[in-house]
């Protein structure tokens, strides 16, 4: 059995195959996921699992050098945005429109769908290197 915190085999598999600058998205339950992008659907019921707890778990495993966030997030969901900033600390944030974020999903290795229902609870994580 794994010793690290992330137990989901699908997420672990995607992360283990990621190289520098590859992208992984985490989204709320309403985020449209392109057909060509792998969907890892964790959503059970409204709010479960939550976006923040999913983000924290993934960041335990994935080295991230940059995140892409919809610029609408800060205005529409300021509490969520503040939590994200606290979690990612000094990681570079690139703001793009929500429409641009949805277009970027086709280039992600996978999208992890949560049960989150907070507006704009979506993020794209760009993989860094550990050396």
UniProtKB/Swiss-Prot annotation:
Enzyme's top EC category: isomerase
Subcellular localization: Cytoplasm
Residues holding substrate: 28, 98, 120-122
Enzyme Commission designation: 5.4.99.62
Catalytic machinery residues: 20
Main location: cytoplasm
Annotated keywords: Carbohydrate metabolism, Cytoplasm, Isomerase
GO CC annotation: cytosol
Pathway: Carbohydrate metabolism; D-ribose degradation; D-ribose 5-phosphate from beta-D-ribopyranose: step 1/2
Catalyzed reaction equations: beta-D-ribopyranose = beta-D-ribofuranose
Domain of life: Bacteria
InterPro entries tied to this protein: D-ribose_pyranase (IPR023064), RbsD-like_sf (IPR023750), RbsD_FucU (IPR007721)
UniProt GO MF annotations: D-ribose pyranase activity; intramolecular lyase activity; monosaccharide binding
An annotated GO BP: D-ribose catabolic process
Function statement: Catalyzes the interconversion of beta-pyran and beta-furan forms of D-ribose.
Family the UniProt entry places it in: Belongs to the RbsD / FucU family. RbsD subfamily.
Subunit structure: Homodecamer.
Protein name in UniProt: D-ribose pyranase
The organism of origin for this protein: Clostridium perfringens (strain ATCC 13124 / DSM 756 / JCM 1290 / NCIMB 6125 / NCTC 8237 / Type A)
GN (gene name): rbsD
């Amino acid at each position: 059995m794994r010793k690290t915190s992330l137990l989901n085999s699908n997420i672990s598999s995607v992360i283990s195959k990621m190289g520098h600058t590859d992208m992984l998205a985490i989204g709320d339950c309403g985020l449209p996921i392109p057909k060509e992008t792998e969907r890892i659907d964790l959503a059970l019921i409204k709010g479960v699992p939550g976006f923040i707890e999913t983000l924290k778990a993934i960041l335990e495993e994935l080295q991230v050098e940059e995140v892409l966030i919809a610029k609408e997030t800060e205005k529409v969901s300021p509490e969520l945005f503040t939590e994200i900033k606290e979690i990612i600390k000094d990681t570079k944030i690139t703001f793009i429109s929500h429409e641009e974020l949805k277009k970027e999903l086709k280039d992600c290795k996978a999208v992890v769908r949560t049960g989150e229902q907070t507006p704009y609870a979506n993020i794209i994580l760009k993989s860094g290197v550990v050396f």
